[in-house]
């Protein structure tokens, strides 16, 4: 039986009513017209989720082949175009304090202020980035699947695991400060419930923290229905009606496209959507994948957790690369838009069932007594008895397998049938490809697709399994670097063929000019950094732009943290830029009136992107002061070791585990 180790400090007041009501929670019968009544052919202010559209779709919102538009549906708008109508397309001016410091002390960076910008967001730019043509791809043959599965296991190193119970997903380190999904922000029932049940730490009436208790309370019934019936409601005896109801359910729980403005050169403005996925979708993902994500941190997994630049990862890659002859770096174009459903279906239906154990029930948390005491105390305060389930007999394997299979099948169906809503209220569905960026498993599924396409190409080219296993593969989403024992000529021959094969077979586009086939270690590039004998380097010009043009409104304290973050992000490669960061830190710190430690505490969100995939950052890096140049150099000069599965979880192995695939074959 798998055991999850739950950090004590993750227990918060996020379960309130859901915990107290655990013993008397019931699943109500869904009324006959329950889902149909969410369509309101009335004025916009009167409809709940969507209304019927009374005008044609404008030509600039007509999608390309492979994307379905719901012409008759009108959703709520979240457009910010009017707020920025007087702004130039290049966006706002640089931070005044940073710009003044550069003019007075660092005039060599003035050109960088003119080169870079944070472009103005717009509804058109969001739709244009989403709107990419898709094409049908054929599934793998059974013979190819049989070769791919053991090779994928070789490189991912994921062992079979128990899934997590709905209640225990609360201990995943959720980020609750971001905007809640479309459904919660427009559901009258959820808003009314959240008004009374939101926790004290809620940061606003549109945030996940405001709706967390309402979500946990109501969606447990929905998840129960999915496990029992494969639908988020109790199905009728009419299968056609069930499909209609399910389609309506997907439409009322859409994924909202929010705006993210990327640092850009003024002749190539980049505004991208951020996919605000439904909270219940992410909750189901956590049930199925929490232990998997813990294992992805291990050394024998090819996903590059633990090799972060800030932890000396480039130094480790330099050391390893000495044993190899050639290196391949593939730069994918529009990866998240073009990743075919063929491979995501392969992930859900073929690979995932081989990794989920079904003979021990749900994973048990190792410090069970501490948590069950907390739950019981909360239940008692509500006057509701709560019976401990510590010694509950695990469900029969066949029964549990059906529940797990229903969860996987539903999630895979929703992944394909997800409805996307633009800021100006138009709704679309992808039909052949795409990985939404706002789900829990985005990075893992991207990595899986990346690895699978590579392995399929190696097989198709004619390499044997043993030759393929000689490679050392490092992947993070759509980024990759492959170390090979082959001659440079042999690797070039493969890559030239592979670029055409991926386009013909999967519709995936490789950016040839940004990819690299080399035998020179100093050309190895990982996550935006280039190797320089073990020290990472990158464009200082772009860092100047990022420092001067923050993505969102920032306070003086935020700018202090940003200055620290960019000092680390520059990796001590420029004394001048480090001095700029220090000046910026001193300028904004002087404008605050609180203790430095209080200013910096809890402001990790303002760190640059290199820190985002690194939840353990505070354990290895001091963020309570501005670092010296030597501090940064010392930090990067030595690899700090591979990550462990904790604090996410501890997953033991089994001698003869029974997986979901064994039960369903």
From Swiss-Prot:
<keyword id="KW-0547">Nucleotide-binding</keyword>
<dbReference type="GO" id="GO:0000166">
    <property type="term" value="F:nucleotide binding"/>
</dbReference>
<keyword id="KW-0808">Transferase</keyword>
<keyword id="KW-0693">Viral RNA replication</keyword>
<dbReference type="InterPro" id="IPR001205">
    <property type="entry name" value="RNA-dir_pol_C"/>
</dbReference>
<dbReference type="GO" id="GO:0003723">
    <property type="term" value="F:RNA binding"/>
</dbReference>
<dbReference type="InterPro" id="IPR043502">
    <property type="entry name" value="DNA/RNA_pol_sf"/>
</dbReference>
<protein>
    <recommendedName>
        <fullName>RNA-directed RNA polymerase</fullName>
        <ecNumber>2.7.7.48</ecNumber>
    </recommendedName>
</protein>
<dbReference type="Pfam" id="PF00680">
    <property type="entry name" value="RdRP_1"/>
</dbReference>
<keyword id="KW-0548">Nucleotidyltransferase</keyword>
<comment type="function">
    <text>RNA-dependent RNA polymerase which replicates the viral genome.</text>
</comment>
<keyword id="KW-0696">RNA-directed RNA polymerase</keyword>
<dbReference type="GO" id="GO:0006351">
    <property type="term" value="P:DNA-templated transcription"/>
</dbReference>
<dbReference type="GO" id="GO:0003968">
    <property type="term" value="F:RNA-directed RNA polymerase activity"/>
</dbReference>
